[in-house]
């Protein structure tokens, strides 16, 4: 949930809250790209009786830019519809759900997939079944099989899944939001004069046993790329502008044109780069308008905070921030992609347009030995070259903001020793569900009986 509840307005609207975005060359199908957009943050597995579902009144989209202008060339739209078998019971299910057409499953959801390519709309599929939430051993005794039934194969080599999955993003939210007292380094924190937190401690994964709702689509690379093998990817959620309460029906009715309320490209951008007063605005704009926020990338608040919160630990970073040096390294990583010639044998440059998008060079094959630190760990198949489900994006970005990537654009700069070591103490092994080696790659969701 690298972008969960990150802005005041979207924090009130979880079904439209885009929490994570992944884009990678499929490790088991290397002629395809997998795109995954997660929504609905911090789902408690035992959250009945209604559990969780996508919003019938939300337009979910995954966008692809294949010519570097920060605007969509291909968009996949997902619209959902909830159908009740029996509106006269409060039960989500009336017995074990053994298949997607089980008569015991009351609160079902179906969806339509539409592709818009260069302005031309094409409905790819309709009435595709989502799986239920993972309730427990009596209600969903073989959830993995139910989820597999919900993997749908469409014409053109496209595969889709839309439903609950285990949260794959790992982060110590408790320490991060407690004035960044990162547990492995908390003894070095300023601590505001308090004589506490005087020894290092292991990180705690705040998302270890929560679920999300994922929209996953696997598409042949040949159906996405243009002249450049690098794709720009982002997701968005939109609502219609007018909401009217129908007292007789006891429900809201939406009408009018669609208005974007959530956006996500690179992880943690709206979370830690964009200031509080601009977060809601940022969510409504396309990536091509990122120039309006360029100063926050050039002079990021977090890079100035780290030396203040950890006195004496980041002296070189402090000098960089005090000098007002433009962080061209962060602009490249997050806004344009990294041009060729900076990292030997690597580039994911889309052009001069500043746009917050995941940038994936589809010509780079999956790694046989993935390193969750991605490019800074010597693995060009990982973040910021797209983003794989196991990539440690918090630590990668934290180290980048701490200055470890400055030498990419300024060979004279020496990162502080701490810049290459700072972390919240978590790794991909901190995810109890683990990850799958095949579509949809995120783990089986935690069930409500065993994970209350």
Where are these predicted regions, by residue range?
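Surface-exposed extracytoplasmic segments
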Residues: 1-452
């Amino acid at each position: 949930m690298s972008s969960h509840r990150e802005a005041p307005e979207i924090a009130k609207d979880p079904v439209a809250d885009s929490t994570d975005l992944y884009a990678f060359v499929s490790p088991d199908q290397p002629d395809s790209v997998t795109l995954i957009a997660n929504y609905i943050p911090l789902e408690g597995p035992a959250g009945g009786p209604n559990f969780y579902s996508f919003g019938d009144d939300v337009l979910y989209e995954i966008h692809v830019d294949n010519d570097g202008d920060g605007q969509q060339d291909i968009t996949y739209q997902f619209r959902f519809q909830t159908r009740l078998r029996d509106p006269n019971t409060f039960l989500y299910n009336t017995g074990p759900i053994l298949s997607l057409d089980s008569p015991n499953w009351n609160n079902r959801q179906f969806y339509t997939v539409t592709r818009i390519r260069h302005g031309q709309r094409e409905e790819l599929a309709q009435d595709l079944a989502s799986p239920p939430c993972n309730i427990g051993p009596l209600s969903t005794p073989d959830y993995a099989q139910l989820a597999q039934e919900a993997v749908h194969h469409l014409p053109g080599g496209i595969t889709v899944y839309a439903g609950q999955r285990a949260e794959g993003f790992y982060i110590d939210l408790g320490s991060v939001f407690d004035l960044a007292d990162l547990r492995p380094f908390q003894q070095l924190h300023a601590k505001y004069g308090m004589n506490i937190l005087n020894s290092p401690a292991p990180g705690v994964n705040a998302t270890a046993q929560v679920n999300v709702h994922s929209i996953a689509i696997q598409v042949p690379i040949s159906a996405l790329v243009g002249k450049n093998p690098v794709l720009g990817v982002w997701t968005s959620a939109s609502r219609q502008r007018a909401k009217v309460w129908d007292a007789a029906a006891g429900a809201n009715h939406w009408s009018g044109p669609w208005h974007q309320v959530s956006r996500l490209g690179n992880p943690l951008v709206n979370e830690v780069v964009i200031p509080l007063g601009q977060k809601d605005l940022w969510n409504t704009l396309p990536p091509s308008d990122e120039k309006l926020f360029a100063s926050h990338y050039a002079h990021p608040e977090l890079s100035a905070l780290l030396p203040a919160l950890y006195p004496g630990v980041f002296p070189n970073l402090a000098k960089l921030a005090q000098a007002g040096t433009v962080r061209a390294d962060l602009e490249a990583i997050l806004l344009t992609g990294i041009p060729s010639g900076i990292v030997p044998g690597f580039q994911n440059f889309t052009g001069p347009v500043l746009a917050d998008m995941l940038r994936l060079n589809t010509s780079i094959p999956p790694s046989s030995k993935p390193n969750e630190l991605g490019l800074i760990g010597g693995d060009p198949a990982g973040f910021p070259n797209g983003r794989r489900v196991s990539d440690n994006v918090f630590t990668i970005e934290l180290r980048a903001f701490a200055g470890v990537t400055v030498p990419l654009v300024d060979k004279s700069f020496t990162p502080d020793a701490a810049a290459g070591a700072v972390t919240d103490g978590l790794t991909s092994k901190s995810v109890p569900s683990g990850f799958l080696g095949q579509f949809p790659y995120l783990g089986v969701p935690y069930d409500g009986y065993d994970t209350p």
